[in-house]
Design a protein with these regions (language model features):
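ATP phosphate-binding glycine-rich loop
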Residues: 44-50
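ATP-binding glycine-rich loop module of kinase domains
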Residues: 52-100
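Catalytic-loop of the protein kinase fold
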Residues: 163, 167-180
Length: 180
């Protein structure tokens, strides 16, 4: 019996005859190439990506709730765990609604613009601009001295403005942390 092969980036099952994951490096919506996985949380997976028409970098957020999702098959379809089908579908719709709401208010100062939201592979993807940069925690760790209050305020003001824009339309971020 041959051991099951798993993609080290998205943890999807690989067929024995393929050498490249059909999901990572694959093209979504006919326009976005999925790159390396950057992070994973309870809501889903964040990938680097490329928009293939204008050839610019993007960030792709995939709805994949770990507590509700079964293993992704070789067909790249995301399946809910047995008994979690209704909650999976409901939260998938919530994910799509959230990113479509953010798309309507961006580009608000301090928020990455949501460029596209679409369904494919029995999941939802949100494509966002990728302005580059490094996470705040990494920037702080690499500094030789503490940050002044004025520098911190100036640097974080766009974040405050973005959160305020979200609150004005009834959205709550729930994911702000120095690692982002």
């Amino acid at each position: 019996m041959e051991a099951k092969r798993i993609c080290p980036y998205c943890m999807g099952e690989l067929e024995s005859r393929v050498s490249v994951c059909p999901h990572c490096g694959g093209v979504l919506a006919g326009r976005y190439t999925v790159g390396e996985m950057q992070s994973i949380d309870g809501e889903g997976i964040l990938y680097r990506g490329v928009e293939n028409v204008g050839r610019f970098r993007v960030t792709i957020k995939e709805y994949m709730p770990l507590t509700l999702s079964a293993e992704r098959g070789t067909d790249a379809l995301l399946r809910p765990k047995l008994g979690s089908e209704v909650l999976f579908k409901t939260t998938r719709m919530d994910f799509a609604d959230l990113y479509r709401s953010i798309q309507r208010i961006t580009p608000a100062n301090g928020l990455e613009a949501v460029l596209d939201v679409f369904e494919e592979n029995n999941t939802v993807y949100a494509v966002m601009e990728n302005p580059g940069g490094i996470p705040l925690q990494q920037w702080l760790d690499e500094r030789p001295s503490p940050v002044s209050a004025e520098t911190a305020r100036n640097m974080l003001q766009p974040v405050f403005d973005g959160v305020a824009a979200m609150h004005q339309v009834g959205l709550v971020h729930r994911g702000i942390c120095p690692e982002n």
